[in-house]
């Protein structure tokens, strides 16, 4: 039985032996949070809001936080990771778990949900389903910054040049306690930005869980395209738009974001 406390993680072993750290708090039905790029479990400002009536499990994806890594990284390995954690959480709870994934984590979650029956409801916040990787010159700039130890610069390149994040939002993120953890994940960026993140139609059609897609009304067009792709592929899917928000609405307006999630999960 998992001990649900915020003081330390428990671990799940993935298919290739990678150990994945999971941080749990709260009581009630299970909810798994899967973060995106430039993040670990500490990026979630909504944990306390969601844990009012749920056991919230926030995993560290491989290569960051309390999780280990492996040399042969592919998105497929990370999908296997999420499936492993979903099944561990569901086994501990004795019931299927709800799942919330953001960005790259959302991409992993929609693929994982097509492979396991242990997802009750699925929330995807701007899942990063992209047919083309970032331009080689941009990836090279990020890699050069990482190689030189300029991790903060690498993260800021991504936020400014890929997400088109307003300077006010970037300044807000810099002031948060999770900023050092974001910066520490910079070495994982080149690999994630060098590959397409494709959604197989058959895999998406296998998602049986009711699914909520959340998008920011002001988010970049490539994320809007991703929303349309997923909405047209997952059978039981609805879309909610957060007007005036972009890719970090859970940071800029956590109360509203959490309320949208909680309302859907009550269904």
Locations of regions flagged by a protein language model:
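Conserved alpha/beta-hydrolase catalytic His-Asp/Glu region
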Residues: 135, 151-190
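Active-site loop/oxyanion-hole signature of alpha/beta-hydrolase fold enzymes
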Residues: 57-100, 259
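Conserved serine/cysteine hydrolase catalytic core
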Residues: 181-233, 238-241
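Short beta-to-alpha linker loops that shape the active-site pocket of alpha/beta-hydrolase fold enzymes
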Residues: 60-65, 128, 243-245
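Glycine-rich His-Gly loop
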Residues: 33-37, 103, 216
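Catalytic histidine-centered segment of alpha/beta-hydrolase-like enzymes
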Residues: 242-258
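Conserved HGGG/HGGXW glycine-rich cap/lid loop of the alpha/beta-hydrolase fold
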Residues: 5-68
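Conserved hydrolase catalytic core segment
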Residues: 95-133
């Amino acid at each position: 039985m998992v001990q649900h406390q915020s003081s330390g993680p428990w671990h799940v072993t993935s298919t290739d032996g990678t150990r994945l750290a999971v941080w749990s708090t709260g009581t009630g039905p299970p909810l798994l949070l899967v973060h995106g790029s430039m993040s670990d479990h500490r990026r979630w400002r909504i944990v306390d809001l969601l844990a009012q009536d749920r056991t919230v499990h926030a995993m560290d994806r491989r290569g960051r936080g309390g999780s280990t890594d492996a040399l042969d990284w592919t998105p497929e390995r990370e999908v296997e990771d999420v499936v492993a954690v979903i099944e561990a959480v569901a086994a501990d709870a004795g019931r299927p778990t709800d799942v919330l994934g953001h960005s790259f984590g959302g991409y992993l979650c929609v693929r994982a949900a097509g492979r396991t029956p242990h997802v009750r409801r699925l929330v995807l916040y701007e899942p990063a389903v992209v047919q083309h990787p970032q331009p080689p010159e941009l990836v090279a700039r990020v890699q050069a910054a990482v190689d030189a130890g300029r991790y903060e610069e690498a993260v800021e390149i991504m936020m400014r040049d890929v997400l088109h994040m307003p300077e006010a939002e970037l300044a807000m993120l810099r002031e948060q306690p999770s900023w050092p953890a974001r910066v520490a994940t910079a070495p994982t960026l080149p690999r994630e930005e060098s590959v397409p993140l494709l959604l197989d139609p058959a895999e998406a059609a296998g998602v049986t869980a009711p699914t909520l897609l959340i998008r920011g009304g002001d988010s970049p067009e490539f994320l809007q395209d991703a929303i349309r792709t997923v909405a047209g592929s997952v059978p039981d899917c609805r879309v909610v738009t957060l007007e005036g928000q972009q890719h970090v609405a859970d940071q800029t307006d956590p109360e509203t974001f959490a309320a949208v999630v909680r309302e859907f999960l009550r269904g």
